[in-house]
Each structure stands twice: as structure tokens, then as C-alpha cells.
Amino acid sequence: MKLIFIYGLPASGKLTVAQELVAITGYKLFHNHLVVDLLLSVFEFGSPEFVALREEIWLSIFEQACRSQLPGLIFTFAPEATVRPGFINRMLRTVADAGGEVDFIELICPLPELKRRMGSLSRLQYKKLTSVPLFEELHREGSFEAGYMPKARLSIDTSICTPARSALQIARALDLIPVN
């Protein structure tokens, strides 16, 4: 199984691009906020229980998806301070041990555009960060740095590339569709 690991700051367009990539590839989408929202119904964000269960669920889904012979899975991820050190290496090992491979895709976007996107209605569907002052504070504190991230196979600036074009670039870079 190919795990397409899309990461970037909040509001960089991870879910929107991932949805476009699903339309191209037919791969399943594992949106990070599904797990986050589940756990927020019981635990406070960042609590030890939240952090441990979030990682356990992520890794379990990756392993089972590989073992189930899915051709591919698209995962959205926002590096941040509550992700345990070593998660990326544990994820890589879990996927490899189950016979899968991981491709990292980074979405970047200038801060003014990220702040503009914070209040969009699409961010309200999940319990996503929508407060610009809180985003600024967290960014200033380095909260969106989760340590080691492997070099991305592709980095896309979503302020100058539409979600559909971004998904097409990803699909082409990963040889998921023929290059015309």
C-alpha cells in the first residue's frame, strides 16, 4: 500500500487537496481530524490520554490498511507540539513492517493567506483552529513544529496553486497517473 502523507500548517489546504487527490486516485482518505474529533469528545486536547490514543489509532489504521491490501491511503497531518517525539519514525516502521511505503507531500502557504483562511466555513465542520490570534500565538511559540519530518517528495505552495492542480501535481509526481 502507498501511504500519501500530506502535511502542512493549519489552513494550508491539506483536506481540500486530499479530497481532490481522492477524486483522481480512488484512494481512501484518512483525515486526521476524524481521530482528533473522536478523542475530543472524551479527552482534552494534548492530555496524556489524548496523545497516546491518537497515535495508537493512527498507527493501527496505517497497519490495518496495509494488511488489507488497499492500494493507497491519503493521510492529512499538521505537525504540532503534542505529537510525541519519534512518531514519524514509528509510523514509517509500522507501514514498512506491514508491507507499505510512505510518500511525504508538504503543503506550504504564506502566513497572511493562512490567517485569511482561518475563518472559512469549511474549517468549522471539524473542530479546526479558526482563531487568528490563537494561531499567531501558537505559531510564535513554535507549537506547529513536531520535530523530525522527512524530506517531502513534493512541496506545493497552495496560495498559488489550486487544490485540483495541487492534487494533479501530486498524482503525477507519485506516478499515479500518466504524465501528458
Label for each model-derived stretch:
Residues 6:
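Hydrophobic anchor at the beta1->P-loop junction of P-loop NTPases
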Residues 53-106:
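Glycine-rich phosphate-binding loop used to anchor ATP phosphates in small-molecule kinases
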Residues 120-169, 180:
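Small-molecule kinase domains that catalyze NTP-dependent phosphoryl transfer to phosphate-bearing small molecules
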Residues 98-119, 156:
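Conserved phosphate-donor/acceptor-positioning beta-strand/loop module used by diverse small-molecule
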Residues 13:
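Conserved glycine(s) of the Walker
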Residues 3:
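Walker A (P-loop) ATP-phosphate-binding motif of ABC ATPase nucleotide-binding domains
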Residues 16-66:
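Conserved substrate/cofactor phosphate-moiety recognition/catalytic segment
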Residues 9:
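P-loop (Walker A) phosphate-binding loop of NTP-binding proteins
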